Amino acid sequence: MPERVVIALGGNALQQRGQKGTYEEMMENVKKTAKQIAEIIARGYEVVITHGNGPQVGTILLHMDAGQSLHGIPAQPMDVAGAMSQGWIGYMIQQALRNELRKRGIEREVVTIVTQTIVDKDDPAFENPTKPVGPFYDEETAKKLAKEKGWVVKEDAGRGWRRVVPSPDPKRHVEAETIKKLVEDGVIVIASGGGGVPVIEEDGEIKGVEAVIDKDLAGERLAEEVNADILMILTDVNGAALYYGTEKETWLREVKVDEMERYYQEGHFKAGSMGPKVLAAIRFVKNGGKRAIIAHLEKAVEALEGKTGTQVIP
């Protein structure tokens, strides 16, 4: 049986540091990423793809902000912006990957699923919004918007004021069974983009909430739901490190999950960046996954072969 791998693409798969985020720039980056994924598929792995959406949701929110202030066009809520980003990014990845596979003589269906992720309406994150989203404002404008729209706003590292939203823990994907059926039918599925659209269950119905879900933690849930053997989180560094950015910096290669959990609890991994990646890797292996990998996007194939990156094992 071929091994099934969930590949979680970081922001650098779409937009490199210093780039403006034009369509042409993003498509060029996506084409490079598609080459890596196509090579993994050519080597016989079953692949499911998920991705981040931070800069793209930021762009959508800016577009809405400009449309509302300049033309009176009603802005849509945050969950809608998340769904829009899944369509935008998914379209680019599925097109580039299908083209790359065809170049190699591989005929496969590639499809994007707009995915909803259930979160607990009583998650403590809803009481403490921390995730900055959208444009920067001066203090006066930010506080005016907070009053008008019921937003929570905070000063963001001296750069201005921003809206902050909750980042609740993902529980499961509404479309999990559909995704699994497609994967088992040989379809390459792109799902849970940006962590999925956050929804809560209430009175037997689901409804969107204004929040952002960490895409690596949601990717871990996806990996469990499709019975993946491997979770591979691709980013812009070579893996996880102890004492990162200091003289004592030590890159981790192959680490048993209990040891990795100890490092996590000791606070070695920053909350907004490597922390969720390491937590996702720990959860996946503890919940029965064969291994989890954190590696550089450009070294995905080598990482899958165990030659680079951080490999978390049982």
From Swiss-Prot:
Gene transcribed to yield this protein: cpkA
Main location: cytoplasm
Keywords: ATP-binding, Cytoplasm, Kinase, Nucleotide-binding, Transferase
Record GO biological process: arginine deiminase pathway
Quaternary structure, from the entry: Homodimer.
Catalytic reactions of this protein: hydrogencarbonate + NH4(+) + ATP = carbamoyl phosphate + ADP + H2O + H(+)
Annotated family: Belongs to the carbamate kinase family.
Catalytic activity, EC: 2.7.2.2
One Pfam entry name: AA_kinase
Lineage: Archaea, Methanobacteriati, Methanobacteriota, Thermococci, Thermococcales
GO CC terms of this entry: cytosol
Molecular function (Gene Ontology), one example: ATP binding
Name the UniProt record assigns to this protein: Carbamate kinase
InterPro entries: AceGlu_kinase-like_sf, Asp/Glu/Uridylate_kinase, Carb_kinase, Shikimate_kinase_CS
Species assigned in the record: Pyrococcus abyssi (strain GE5 / Orsay)
